[in-house]
Amino acid sequence: MSFSVDVLANIAIELQRGIGHQDRFQRLITTLRQVLECDASALLRYDSRQFIPLAIDGLAKDVLGRRFALEGHPRLEAIARAGDVVRFPADSELPDPYDGLIPGQESLKVHACVGLPLFAGQNLIGALTLDGMQPDQFDVFSDEELRLIAALAAGALSNALLIEQLESQNMLPGDAAPFEAVKQTQMIGLSPGMTQLKKEIEIVAASDLNVLISGETGTGKELVAKAIHEASPRAVNPLVYLNCAALPESVAESELFGHVKGAFTGAISNRSGKFEMADNGTLFLDEIGELSLALQAKLLRVLQYGDIQRVGDDRSLRVDVRVLAATNRDLREEVLAGRFRADLFHRLSVFPLSVPPLRERGDDVILLAGYFCEQCRLRQGLSRVVLSAGARNLLQHYSFPGNVRELEHAIHRAVVLARATRSGDEVILEAQHFAFPEVTLPPPEVAAVPVVKQNLREATEAFQRETIRQALAQNHHNWAACARMLETDVANLHRLAKRLGLKD
């Protein structure tokens, strides 16, 4: 099999049909998997010596949440170092990053792998990976044909990153600096709530407005603050953190505004406060609702006039600080109850942001679980950490009152328990490794099978044939989508369909 002009044109057309970058990336990966008849494909973005998945097909959903650091993945490091197509032999000693992450093939290791580094000029911006369960799966494709695919993918990714850079810097195309991948705090999640939050972060980051970030404990409010700072014009200056809930009343004013020598017992020298440290940068005040009313009044003055006074000093100091505040309380209710100043609330909430709880984020829980699994793999020196189907089902049906923080701790604990029950450096997390309160899981759906006079083989094939027909109908005869619904490999599905007479 080889590429024709029609095949390449079809890939290019699919890229143009996409609505937005993410849709184009997914169309590219899905089309490539169909054309190459491979078992899995992925588009990865390169940033700070790690590959970040942008789109996948044929891989477990949690792969989208993983961050593949080069030092922990020698195959990906080889792709990053190469300037051309990389083919890994079936007996390669380098472990494949996707071993155990192809649904329905968890117990098998990937046999065939091709890596295509993607460049914008001389800069590495990403990679395409193609994987198959057959050792000779990609032998029929020449390096030149694969280079054409890489060029199409590199063009799509390069354009997306350049547009992202221009938008983040509020520049016109003619003002663009030399291409450089935009570095931002990674906020993992594709749910509607997180997608909207990311858009709002992009909007407010370019301004100098104060921001009030609200959300339940453990939702990631500090990560939102970091994302705002890193995407703002103040990113070259410090982001200073202060947890207001951990401040004893006796030292709170000094922590915020500093003090001079002799201002109080123990003040043996002059000391800068958080506002001075954050001058020309950003100050993140976590748990702002815990500040006393007296301190709220002094904070309000800083926001109004831009100057501070160290404790024990009559002189004022000018500061240029952007304030980001976070709370897990309803500050409107706190204002009505007299525990929070209304004028300070309005000063802080010029641009309010709300971080959704994990229970409202759908499949984001699986992406985040993948991220934490990869963290555990690196920290504990394991070759792989994967979630079983039962574990994924459990995570999707647990409410996580502690939100993302609870999920992180649950994954770390589960890895420790799983390691204790099996030898070796490969860990599979099962449902029993999670110590959640009782979770009611939906019963598996079992299709009714009519009673017919058939032997077991004929009945099995009839059931398979009807199941595939229904899945195809529900997915508009898209074989890749059908395979995902049936949780099987698309190449295996094609072979089964041919055997059952559903495909020529």
From Swiss-Prot:
<dbReference type="InterPro" id="IPR003018">
    <property type="entry name" value="GAF"/>
</dbReference>
<dbReference type="GO" id="GO:0003677">
    <property type="term" value="F:DNA binding"/>
</dbReference>
<dbReference type="InterPro" id="IPR025943">
    <property type="entry name" value="Sigma_54_int_dom_ATP-bd_2"/>
</dbReference>
<keyword id="KW-0238">DNA-binding</keyword>
<dbReference type="InterPro" id="IPR029016">
    <property type="entry name" value="GAF-like_dom_sf"/>
</dbReference>
<keyword id="KW-0597">Phosphoprotein</keyword>
<feature type="DNA-binding region" description="H-T-H motif">
    <location>
        <begin position="479"/>
        <end position="498"/>
    </location>
</feature>
<dbReference type="InterPro" id="IPR003593">
    <property type="entry name" value="AAA+_ATPase"/>
</dbReference>
<feature type="domain" description="Sigma-54 factor interaction">
    <location>
        <begin position="187"/>
        <end position="416"/>
    </location>
</feature>
<dbReference type="Pfam" id="PF00158">
    <property type="entry name" value="Sigma54_activat"/>
</dbReference>
<feature type="binding site">
    <location>
        <begin position="278"/>
        <end position="287"/>
    </location>
    <ligand>
        <name>ATP</name>
    </ligand>
</feature>
<dbReference type="InterPro" id="IPR002078">
    <property type="entry name" value="Sigma_54_int"/>
</dbReference>
<dbReference type="InterPro" id="IPR009057">
    <property type="entry name" value="Homeodomain-like_sf"/>
</dbReference>
<feature type="binding site">
    <location>
        <begin position="215"/>
        <end position="222"/>
    </location>
    <ligand>
        <name>ATP</name>
    </ligand>
</feature>
<dbReference type="GO" id="GO:0016887">
    <property type="term" value="F:ATP hydrolysis activity"/>
</dbReference>
<keyword id="KW-0804">Transcription</keyword>
<dbReference type="InterPro" id="IPR027417">
    <property type="entry name" value="P-loop_NTPase"/>
</dbReference>
<keyword id="KW-0805">Transcription regulation</keyword>
<dbReference type="InterPro" id="IPR025662">
    <property type="entry name" value="Sigma_54_int_dom_ATP-bd_1"/>
</dbReference>
<comment type="function">
    <text>Required for the expression of anaerobic nitric oxide (NO) reductase, acts as a transcriptional activator for at least the norVW operon. Activation also requires sigma-54.</text>
</comment>
<comment type="pathway">
    <text>Nitrogen metabolism; nitric oxide reduction.</text>
</comment>
<dbReference type="GO" id="GO:0005524">
    <property type="term" value="F:ATP binding"/>
</dbReference>
<keyword id="KW-0547">Nucleotide-binding</keyword>
<dbReference type="InterPro" id="IPR023944">
    <property type="entry name" value="NorR"/>
</dbReference>
<dbReference type="GO" id="GO:0003700">
    <property type="term" value="F:DNA-binding transcription factor activity"/>
</dbReference>
<protein>
    <recommendedName>
        <fullName>Anaerobic nitric oxide reductase transcription regulator NorR</fullName>
    </recommendedName>
</protein>
<feature type="modified residue" description="4-aspartylphosphate">
    <location>
        <position position="57"/>
    </location>
</feature>
<dbReference type="Pfam" id="PF01590">
    <property type="entry name" value="GAF"/>
</dbReference>
<dbReference type="InterPro" id="IPR025944">
    <property type="entry name" value="Sigma_54_int_dom_CS"/>
</dbReference>
<keyword id="KW-0067">ATP-binding</keyword>
<dbReference type="GO" id="GO:0000160">
    <property type="term" value="P:phosphorelay signal transduction system"/>
</dbReference>
